[in-house]
Design a protein with these regions (language model features):
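Catalytic cores of extracellular degradative/oxidative enzymes
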Residues: 1-146, 154-157
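Beta/coil-rich, acidic/histidine-enriched accessory regions frequently appended to metallopeptidases
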Residues: 172-229
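Recognizes extended acidic, P/S/T-rich segments that occur
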Residues: 260-301, 314-318
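Extracellular fibronectin type III
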Residues: 315-332
Length: 332
């Protein structure tokens, strides 16, 4: 029983509902109400499982993914259970206990080759949220766990237990947005672009609420599975530039994947059509932080100019701007 006490304590701590209010009970029988095992109070399993679960040596060496999984169900909280993840969130317990208590991966579905193959297939097929469930969805959480440990997920889950009624998410869309907000705040990073890459339907208000946090720009999807767009902010030129030049500046908030920046400028705004611009400069790649480019060869003496920046990669392009300025009448 000491071994199972430890296992259950680890599950309680993982899901963050402490102190756990009850003793978990299990019933083993020749005929149960559904399946091989099922969650509930009591948790139920067939009597063929009894020899293993009372053999502490076997449990310590092999664990029992299914037992951990069903007991994980008993810890799920519906407001934090995203659409498609009923059979995912309970596997947090299975992964955690198999790895950190037993010391093995415990399931063929989470060996590196299977994880890579499943993730690659998901993104090659368009990263549709309708396909985001069970093992694919688990991968989304595992990548976060491997960057920040389970504690980030525990902290986010714990928020839900004390939410005022007005903030409890009910619809699928509310749950997706709420989770990304709480998990981002837990990690201290903006995880909206990461979850949007997986296909989660996020509102613009979620992106806006997190734009004070740095973007997770080295997540495992980047380059290998998904090409992110860049996000530039604060595109600026002095309203009165030099006689024949100006410095165009901006903040690269997210440098995306394999991004090339091109600056388009001219005496009229060409919009989002490359062919409508009279001049362009290829700036190339950009790093997170402040950046700029000097534009020279401008006409002097009060000539009005417009500029936009295009950030492009093989996945598409995003335009930023416009910004406007007028050239000075003298070098003074």
């Amino acid at each position: 029983m000491d071994w199972w006490d430890q296992a259950l304590s680890m599950e309680h701590e993982l899901y963050g509902f402490l102190p756990w209010p009850r003793v978990e009970r299990a019933v083993f029988d020749a005929q149960i109400s559904a399946g091989w095992m099922h969650s509930g109070y009591p948790f139920m399993a067939h009597d063929l499982s009894v020899p293993g679960v009372v053999n502490v040596s076997q449990m310590a060496e092999e664990g029992d993914w299914g037992m951990f999984h069903e007991l994980g169900h008993n810890h799920q909280w519906m407001p934090s259970t995203l659409p498609g993840t009923t059979e995912t969130g309970c596997n947090f317990a299975s992964v955690h206990l198999m790895e950190d208590l037993v010391g093995i991966s415990g399931h063929g579905a989470i060996i590196p080759e299977q994880r890579d193959s499943r993730t690659r297939s998901y993104f090659e097929n368009g990263a549709n949220i309708s396909d985001w469930s069970v093992w694919v969805a688990l991968e989304t959480f595992l990548m976060v766990k491997e960057e920040w440990s389970w504690s980030a997920i525990t902290t986010a889950l714990s928020v839900y237990y004390d939410l005022p009624a007005s903030e409890v998410p009910y619809t699928g869309e509310e749950k997706f947005n709420s989770w990304v907000l709480h998990l981002s705040n837990s990690t201290g990073m903006n995880l909206a672009p990461y979850h949007a890459a997986w296909g989660l339907p996020l509102d613009q208000s979620t992106f806006d609420s997190l734009d004070h946090l740095p973007v997770w720009v080295d997540d495992p999807l980047r380059g290998d599975y998904f090409e992110y767009p860049a996000i530039l902010r604060g595109l600026h030129s002095p309203s009165i530039s030099g006689t024949n030049s100006t410095n165009l500046s901006w903040e690269t908030y997210d440098n995306g994947t394999n991004i090339t920046l091109t600056v388009f400028y001219g005496e009229s705004d060409g919009g989002l059509q490359q062919s409508a611009w009279s001049n362009s400069i290829v700036h190339g790649s950009t790093d997170v932080g402040d950046d700029y480019i000097e534009i020279t060869g401008l006409s002097c003496c009060g000539t009005d100019y417009y500029a936009r920046i295009r950030a492009s990669n093989d996945a598409g392009e995003t335009w930023f701007g416009p910004v406007t300025w007028s050239t000075d009448y003298s070098d003074d």
